[in-house]
Every structure is written in C-alpha cells, then in structure tokens.
C-alpha cells in the first residue's frame, strides 16, 4: 500500500507566517501559525526583519508536519503564497539582508513617487507595468534601500546583492541559495516588470537605478522551481512547485479562472480581483492591471482594487483604541446598535488605495454628536470595510463592462456575519462565502499540486468547492444610495490632509 500523500502550502502574510497541510480532497489536515514583529521606525514607515520572516515560516513548516503526524516523504509538493510588494535586499554570499524588509504598507517612498510623477512617468508606468505610481509597490522601496545603504548600489552592480519579494526570499532560504526565482504574479507587483512583454522593464530599472543583476528569474505560477530538504522525520527533498502572490492565490483558490469572475479577500487590507482572461484591461478608474493565474497556472490578467485598511482597522479598535479586546467582539458590539447614528469612519491611516490613490489622506471620524457611543464607532469601522469594497467594485464594473452577479469572499473578516450581510446590502449583490476559508493557502496548494500531477486538472478541483453561506441584499436601493453618498462625502473630507513636504 502506498503512503498517503499531502500538499503543504506556506502562507507568508503581513502579520504572521502559516503552514497548511491539505489532503487530496482539499481538506485542511493541519495548520500552524506564528506571528512576528511589526517594526515602525517612523510614522507611516513599516518594516519586517527578513530573518524573523524566515524563522517564523520555517518553524511553522516543521510544526505543521509534527501536528499532522506525517513525515516529509509524504509531501508531494510545497506551494508558496506571500504578502506582495514587500521588498528585501540581501547578500548573495552570506544570505544576510542589508536592511529590513520594507513592507507594502510603508509610505516612506512617497517623495520618490512624487518625483516620478513630476518626470511625467505616470502614463508609461500604467501602460507597461499596469500599476499606478504609489509607494505601495516594490520598485521605489528597492531604490530607497540602494540610496540609503552605503555602497549597496555598486555591490548590486557587481552581482553581490540580490532583490526579492517574500516568495523569492523564502525559496532562496529553502534551497540554501541555489534558486533565485519569482513568479509572474509577484513580479507584476514590483513596478519593474513589463506585464505585456513578461520581462523586467529596462526603462524602469534605468529610471530607478536598479541593476538588473540583482533581479530574480521570473517563471510560471505552477511548475517545479527547485527542491527543499526538510529536517524532521526523513529529511526528504521536496519539490517547491507553486508560487503566487496572496491575492492571486486567493483568486485561484476560489477557482475564479474564467473571465468576469471576482473575489474579495478581507485580510489586513481588502483586495478585490476580477479575472479578465488573456486580455490586459487598462483601468480608467484608478484600478491596477495585474497578472493572475489561468487554469493551469499560465498568465491571465486581472483588474485589482486594493484597500489598505480592512482587518487592520479592527486591530486599531483593539490595540490602539481599546474599544474591543478581541477582533471577534466587533460583531457583537456592532449589533448592539441599530445603525451608526450618522457616524462614518474613514480608516485612511496610511493614505487611501483604489480608486483614490491619495497617500496624503489620513484617518478621520465624521458625524460625531453627543449621543454617539463606542458601539457606533465599532459599527462604523466595520461598515467602512464594506464601503471601500463598493468603491472598488464600482470602478471594476466601469472598466470591465461586466456587471457582477455574485462576489466570492474569503479572509479572516468573512467570519463576521454582520459585515458580510452589510456588504451584500451596500453592494446590492449576492455574497458567497466558501466552506474552506483558507483560500489563499488553497490556491498555493492547487498550483503546486497541479504542477506535480497530484491533481490532474481544474475539473477535479471544481467539485471540491462548496459555498457555505450566501448573503443577499436586504435593504432598498434608496437607502443603499443614501448611506453610500454619506461615505463619499466623508472620504472627500479625509483626502489631502497631510502636508506634501513633511
């Protein structure tokens, strides 16, 4: 009898590293998770220690196998999914980072972005990389590191330094420095990659003065990139066979592989992606054109809207405001009041993402009167997640010409029934919540499993996808539009708050 085989997905997120073991029926067998430190050197700056990312991720891998009581030779393949855009530069020789990882949320490169705009590069960047000029993406972060770490640019030119997003860093560590790769989805988030030619963009490298020698090789999202030797029982060499940025992995995990299918992930931020097939749709409404995974991990395109603060705004209620002791409490308190009593919370703590793209917006609470209590503020914070999602969906429908009939949802916050119902109410659209919540890990597992023949094709996976609950709109159109217009007014007042030259 042959031993039962499994797939392991490594899900390296913004606040924690996770490892998930899945069986052939796409059931979750075991999960391990470790949080790691968020470093805030200055207001608006966010960093991670790359060695801590690696330590937390590698320990979850060992832990999850022990929990599931399986040996490494029972693993058919490993898939990796990761927080995107976060930039790491390290020494080829030692594997030691020359600076902390600059996280996607970090706004320190706003000045570099302003310079790119002044130099008239916005259209070039949008047309060729699919992105808008914003500190969010990796390119300006790499430039910042090379500008600020003495001698680093010369070392990079000599091939002594390497750049990677988190997937690249993990694979480098897992293969003891033998493999320096990324996939198309992660490359498409750097602002250095031409999404039409599917190669690094020479003009962008030139503009940001980033030596090509430090960049990884770019490959498909579903293929064998290299082998890793896991300790634990057996010490077998296991193929690393899938890579996708977290949002593209979630899109694949939701099996949104046909044109016009969309999902929204509610994590630290909120990310809506709509598959546009083999056509790169240029957005006229502040969305990104990005690379997604087709049915067998090949290049498809997608429209994406990124909201920076979703789950993070609930953490703010918990950690900074001390209004709740646990994120799960937010639903309980939000339903203690019948509405927000006219309050809107705009959680623009690090600026606003799609479709506004204003790095100078700041968080604000509007509509406060004497009768407002903490429950109203908690409810308004939850509602802000749904309003921001509607902002993105309206832009997406305008760009694609596709009217969405159902939105597939995933991520931590989808367990909040109040939020999901309000989301359906404010969109006027069905919201579908899947049985398996770990769709980001699922996507990485699917990509890896398909690459090694663990699963034959998507048809085999389709029957495993079960919708656990469907939410339908429960308010009238006039009420929906009235509430949304209040949100739009609040957003306008929060914009352009911070001074540019500070």
Swiss-Prot record:
Keywords: Allosteric enzyme, ATP-binding, Glycerol metabolism, Kinase, Metal-binding, Nucleotide-binding, Transferase, Zinc. ATP binds at residues 14-16, 268, 311, 315, 412. It holds the Pfam family FGGY_C. GO terms for molecular function: ATP binding; glycerol kinase activity; metal ion binding. One of its GO terms (cellular component) is cytosol. Its EC number is 2.7.1.30. It comes from the Bacteria. Pathway: Polyol metabolism; glycerol degradation via glycerol kinase pathway; sn-glycerol 3-phosphate from glycerol: step 1/1. Gene3D superfamilies: 3.30.420.40. Activity of this regulatory enzyme is affected by several metabolites. Allosterically and non-competitively inhibited by fructose 1,6-bisphosphate (FBP) and unphosphorylated phosphocarrier protein EIIA-Glc (III-Glc), an integral component of the bacterial phosphotransferase (PTS) system. The keyword Kinase applies. Key enzyme in the regulation of glycerol uptake and metabolism. Catalyzes the phosphorylation of glycerol to yield sn-glycerol 3-phosphate. Belongs to the FGGY kinase family. Homotetramer and homodimer (in equilibrium). Heterodimer with EIIA-Glc. Binds 1 zinc ion per glycerol kinase EIIA-Glc dimer. The zinc ion is important for dimerization. This is Glycerol kinase. It comes from Salmonella arizonae (strain ATCC BAA-731 / CDC346-86 / RSK2980). The gene is glpK.
